[in-house]
């Protein structure tokens, strides 16, 4: 089956044809580690993990390179370092901030069932020319100046957007129509309002590197142009990120990379996931609905969070609700109950078909429910396919018994008490005391325990 992906640049869904099937290359913008990642940050992590898994399935594990960067130089990081570690030298304070948040981010990603990317470069390692000759930011800026695409002004180096005739293709913003806005800083020394910073001066209390333009630090956009080229080359297959990055970040990445390398494209496919809101409102600290991934994982297993993300197509907006989490938890309970201890074979064709249709995970989840219904009727093959499909998607990371034990522990239900009540109920049923049997059943239900009678005896689980 052919993989089709929606390309933001061309505005259509088309067949994915890699530049080299033996070396499929994908870059996704990672976190800026000034604070712990929030649930909105989890969406691209999960979405592009599924794509990474799918590409590996199609082309082979060793033939796919996935780069997701860590931005560890940023004005917000600088502010956080000065606030949290006022007594330390700035560079040491910055490292403390970024190490703590980057370590937590990796732990969050693991808990969400995501594979680690092939490479996870840090921006600070690519500012200056490197011993290994990989692309760096200073050299890239020099090239842009030499080719007439950048200029020095007021101690900064800026990209000359007018030097690129088709600037604005990704976002659909024509250069002449662009006005100063919230994300475009307008200064008198700019040739055009849309010109953006490649290199800026650093004061004594800001991080900086010595460069041909004085001590300073890179602009946001040049970082990803350098790191992607360093590992994936001048043109690669897929570039991903959130919708909020289309402009200005990805637009400016394209401008820098194409103009520096003289290429027709930076990436051949541009994928963007939709926005996330919480209970119908924009997530923000001021509304009190700002939740970090780590905070969410204190209350919900990573697999529940993962499924809740994947129930919605990645390009659609998602409303993050408690009801949705509860429904996702119930679905996983059902899947574990049906196939949690199945050996598994290969993912079902219906699952792979939905994924190959622009990562239509909403339909994938529907296909998983269909497999479960067939498995519940005694279809062993469907049961194995359900288990294999879920493992392929990053679920079933633990045994059925471990999943059930986790659920019981989280519920606070006393397992010994439940076992004793079930024994009392079994005895009541044996003497045909149906009133007592029903009373015990109701008592268990009030505790949040659901029971199931079969020829083998009575089993129980925590009711969601």
Curated annotation (Swiss-Prot):
Annotated signal sequence range: none
Compartments reported by the entry: Cytoplasm
Chemical reaction(s) catalysed: tRNA(Cys) + L-cysteine + ATP = L-cysteinyl-tRNA(Cys) + AMP + diphosphate
Keywords (A to Z) from UniProt: Aminoacyl-tRNA synthetase, ATP-binding, Cytoplasm, Ligase, Metal-binding, Nucleotide-binding, Protein biosynthesis, Zinc
UniProt motif ('KMSKS' region) ranges: 282-286
Positions bound to ATP: 285
One biological process term in Gene Ontology: cysteinyl-tRNA aminoacylation
Entry-linked SMART domains: DALR_2
Family annotation (Pfam families): CysS_C, DALR_2, tRNA-synt_1e
Residues at which Zn(2+) binds: 29, 224, 249, 253
EC number: 6.1.1.16
Residue window of motif 'HIGH' region: 31-41
Catalytic EC class: ligase
Residue ranges the record marks as coiled coil: none
Highest taxon, organism lineage: Bacteria
Gene Ontology molecular-function annotations: ATP binding; cysteine-tRNA ligase activity; zinc ion binding
GO cellular component: cytosol
Annotated cofactor note: Binds 1 zinc ion per subunit.
Cofactors named for this entry: Zn(2+)
SUPFAM superfamilies reported for this sequence: Anticodon-binding domain of a subclass of class I aminoacyl-tRNA synthetases, Nucleotidylyl transferase
Subunit structure: Monomer.
Record family assignment: Belongs to the class-I aminoacyl-tRNA synthetase family.
Identification of the protein by name: Cysteine--tRNA ligase
Organism the protein comes from: Afipia carboxidovorans (strain ATCC 49405 / DSM 1227 / KCTC 32145 / OM5) (Oligotropha carboxidovorans)
Name of the gene: cysS
């Amino acid at each position: 089956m052919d993989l089709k992906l929606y390309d933001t640049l061309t505005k259509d869904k088309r067949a994915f044809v890699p530049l080299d099937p033996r070396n499929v290359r994908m870059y996704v913008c990672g976190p800026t580690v000034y604070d712990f990642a929030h649930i909105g940050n989890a969406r691209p992590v999960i979405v592009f993990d599924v794509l990474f898994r799918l590409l590996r399935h199609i082309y082979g594990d060793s033939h796919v390179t996935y780069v997701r960067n860590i931005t560890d130089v940023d004005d917000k990081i600088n502010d956080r370092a000065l606030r949290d570690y006022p007594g330390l030298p700035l560079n040491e304070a910055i490292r403390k901030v970024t190490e703590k948040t980057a370590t937590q981010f990796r732990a969050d990603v693991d808990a969400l069932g995501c594979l680690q990317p092939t490479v996870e470069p840090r921006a600070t390692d690519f500012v200056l020319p490197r011993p290994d000759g990989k692309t760096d930011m200073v050299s890239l800026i020099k090239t842009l100046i030499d080719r007439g695409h950048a200029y020095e002004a007021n101690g900064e180096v800026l990209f000359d957007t007018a030097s690129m005739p088709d600037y604005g293709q990704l976002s659909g913003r024509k250069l002449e129509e662009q006005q100063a806005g919230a994300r475009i800083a307008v200064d008198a020394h700019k040739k055009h309002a849309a010109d953006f910073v490649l290199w800026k001066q650093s004061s004594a209390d800001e991080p900086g590197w010595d460069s041909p333009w004085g001590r300073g630090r890179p602009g946001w956009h040049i970082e990803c142009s350098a790191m992607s080229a360093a590992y994936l080359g001048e043109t690669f297959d897929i570039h991903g990120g959130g919708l909020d990055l289309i402009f200005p970040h990805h637009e400016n990445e394209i401008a820098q990379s194409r103009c520096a390398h003289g290429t027709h494209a930076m990436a051949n496919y541009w994928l963007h996931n939709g926005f996330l809101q919480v209970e119908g409102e924009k997530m923000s600290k001021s509304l009190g609905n700002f939740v970090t991934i780590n905070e969410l994982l204190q209350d919900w297993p990573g697999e529940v969070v993962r499924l809740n993300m994947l129930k919605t197509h990645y390009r659609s907006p998602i409303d993050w609700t408690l009801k949705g989490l509860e429904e996702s938890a119930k679905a996983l309970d059902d899947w574990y109950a049906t196939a949690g201890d199945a050996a598994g074979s290969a993912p079902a064709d219906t699952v792979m078909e939905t994924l190959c249709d622009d990562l239509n995970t909403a339909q994938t989840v529907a296909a998983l429910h269909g497999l479960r219904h067939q498995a519940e009727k005694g279809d062993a093959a469907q049961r194995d396919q359900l288990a294999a499909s879920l493992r392929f998607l990053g679920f079933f990371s633990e045994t059925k018994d471990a999943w059930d034990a986790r659920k019981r522990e989280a519920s606070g239900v006393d397992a010994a008490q439940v076992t004793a009540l079930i024994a009392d109920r079994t005895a009541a049923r044996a003497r045909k005391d149906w009133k007592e049997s029903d009373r015990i059943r109701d008592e268990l239900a009030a505790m949040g325990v659901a029971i199931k009678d079969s020829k083998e005896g009575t089993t129980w689980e925590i009711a969601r």
